[in-house]
Amino acid sequence: LEEKYIKHRYAPILPSKNEWPVVKLARERKEFVKKISDLSEKRILDLTGNNHDILKEELETTLYREKLRIKQNPWAVDPDDENEFWGEVKHSLLQVNAESGLTKANRLKQYKSVLHRITSRYAEEIASNFKHTHYKFTRSVVQFGFSRLLNAARVKGFRSIFSTQFSLQDKIQITGETDQLRDLATKGTIVMVPTHFSNLDSILIGWIISVMGLPPFIYGAGLNLFNISIFAYFMNALGAYKVDRRKKNLMYLETLKTYSKESIQYGCHSLFFPGGTRSRSGMIESKVKLGLLSTAIEAQRANYQTGTQDISAKIFVV
């Protein structure tokens, strides 16, 4: 016989919202964004060996790709000042290149200034806008909305939409090592890596996280989802930071990875879809993308090197 599913009520691990890492991070958003920009800039300078010629090449490559993206693949969610910003970057680079009397040190300084403007913009674009009041509202809407839809599917007739015969947890059964997951959340930072099935995954997994009494997770959501206003609201409310998969330049990718790494080090539980895109077959991915996932390893290594001893020191990938 099939074992009967028992609905559990889980007490919140952190009862006060003020204890949630995502709330603490949201309060320090301005300072955190600046930190991400500065660390990304330093990382890029290290990768280019502080060589002004290599840095110039990366800046020009970024400019070219961004101008091409704006022309060939614009999205509604893109900032209104995109053309203006990249036009200013182009003007600055032309100005530096035209000044033949500059020393190598001064030329590098000028390029660093342009780099700083780019990483600052990227960091601000990527950063989440978590608000606790919006999170509570979104949780209620998800629970109410999906419950009504599931009742309509299981109970015949139009009036079934308003039925409360079945709750969301009646249909979506939360099974597995739930107690172990809750225990890990009290001992360190969790990085969750589920298989991606649909655009509703983030919302439904967010609801499951809430039901299990875990504090909200942050996660990278494709910027294309923010083209739809209602999705944008829910994504922001659930702690999503933005991932623009059109941008493949070094400066954007390093800023994105730095944001993920520093968020995990801050103690924010995180969620990645390791396949990078939806699994049409429903099978667990045999090949995973290691870009953002590698930031969990980087964060753990950094914690070890700095001797961090608090709860954020240990990172668990589940």
Predicted regions and their residues:
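Membrane-interfacial terminal anchoring regions of lipid-handling membrane enzymes
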Residues: 1-318
